[in-house]
């Protein structure tokens, strides 16, 4: 699927959690979240096996329990405002997210998936998971409850029948994620979240009204 990249530039010094003066950050969110076409007669997919054991020994691109809590909090705080039950962490979905994120290719590899990227001119810039999910959540004001368009990432975050979540944040090397080798971007974070059952199911007129509550 061809992705249109929406680029937002901001000086982090102007934000509440400002970085040292001079640092520039760029966020990329694919403009078109994927929709899942299903047979209306089909049952919702069965969630993969859940596992909640996380090895405390994590490398730079691992996912610690603290980071899992950040992913869940960023999603479930938003869901709490719109009716759905909280998502629970799923190790299989996380493993799939990490496997894809580690390729550092900026595109979807499945339905029921949100992606985003964050670049910074400073090396070793932190993950900032809350900002990645916050970028998706900020689409809520763009959602059109008549056409069901305009907020594909947000609708997946709050999709009522989604129950399981697995995410990964991966530090990609320079020259990937659409950037050129040797350019100013020193930190390139790639964020991938997988959801099950998958959201954004079409036909939209049948599935969105019962799954998305503005």
UniProtKB/Swiss-Prot annotation:
Keywords: Fruiting body, Glycoprotein, Secreted, Signal. It is found in: Secreted. SMART domains: SCP (SM00198). Gene3D superfamilies: CAP. Residues 1-18 form the signal peptide. InterPro entries: Allrgn_V5/Tpx1_CS, CAP_dom, CAP_sf, CRISP-related. Glycans are attached at residues 61, 144. It holds the Pfam family CAP. Belongs to the CRISP family. PANTHER family: CYSTEINE-RICH SECRETORY PROTEIN-RELATED. This is Fruiting body protein SC14. It comes from Schizophyllum commune.
């Amino acid at each position: 699927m061809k992705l249109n990249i929406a680029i937002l530039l901001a000086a982090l010094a102007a934000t509440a959690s400002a970085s040292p003066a001079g640092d520039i950050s760029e966020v990329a969110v694919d403009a078109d979240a994927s929709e899942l076409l299903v047979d209306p007669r089909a049952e919702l997919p069965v969630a993969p096996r859940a596992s909640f054991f996380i090895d405390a020994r994590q490398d730079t691109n691992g996912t610690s329990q603290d980071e899992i809590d950040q992913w869940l909090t960023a999603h479930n705080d938003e869901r709490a405002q719109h009716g759905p039950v909280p998502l629970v962490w799923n190790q299989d979905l996380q493993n799939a997210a990490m496997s894809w994120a580690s390729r550092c290719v900026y595109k979807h590899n499945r339905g029921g998936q949100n992606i985003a990227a964050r670049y910074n001119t400073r090396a070793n810039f932190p993950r900032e998971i809350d900002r990645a999910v916050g970028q998706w959540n900020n689409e809520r004001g763009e959602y059109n409850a008549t056409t069901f368009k305009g907020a594909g990432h947000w609708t997946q975050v709050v999709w009522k029948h989604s129950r399981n979540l697995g995410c990964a944040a991966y530090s990609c090397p320079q020259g990937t994620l659409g950037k050129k080798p040797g350019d100013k971007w020193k930190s390139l974070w790639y964020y991938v979240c997988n959801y099950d059952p998958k959201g954004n199911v079409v036909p939209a007129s049948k599935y969105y009204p019962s799954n998305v509550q503005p």
